[in-house]
Amino acid sequence: MIYTKTGDKGTTSLIGGTRVSKDDIRLDAYGTFDELSAFVAVLGDSEGVEAHEIEVMDRIQNCLLVLESCLALDSQQSTVNSQQSRVPRLTEDDVKFLEDEIDAINAQLEPLKYLIVPGGNILSSRAHVCRTVCRRAERNLVRMGGEYDVDDVLRRFVNRLSDYFFVLSRLFMKQACVAEKPWGSGCSTGQGSTPLGDRLRSL
């Protein structure tokens, strides 16, 4: 059955069986990655995305499911050891995979000289949505890490993932022959400087 009614009072189960409130930071963390996966699906299903990028996003979605499983594991539960052995893990190979993809895309792009304003191409804009949702998911992951153990590999993977969507957004603009919109154009602030742009992008 799709519905169990066990969550009707605002609680749900972690892997291990512990019941927690649905506003628990762990649910907020893995729920945001689930949201991110849905946005990745929208991007991957969009017309004009090339086969290689679709393959990369398929792998990313699988990695996100692994990540969600890790976050849903109750590390404080006494039965966790038996559960833990059956939960897949992200590895350094997954981080390296993203780094290689980032480097390959970045090699095709002009050096970044200013802060970019999203917009101008639907694929690029959808990649920016993925990037910003990923950053929100990362903030939840950091908050979760203040109360529970979070594997450093997960942190690195998520940090690289937002960078991947950033360079992908730029690649889509290049492929569409659309000029990137620099921050400050048409605004009283003036052109965004390179140091400021780099600083804001790295937040």
Question: Where do the protein language model's features map onto the residues?
Answer:
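Phosphate/pyrophosphate-binding loop motifs in nucleotide- or prenyl diphosphate-using proteins
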Residues: 1-203
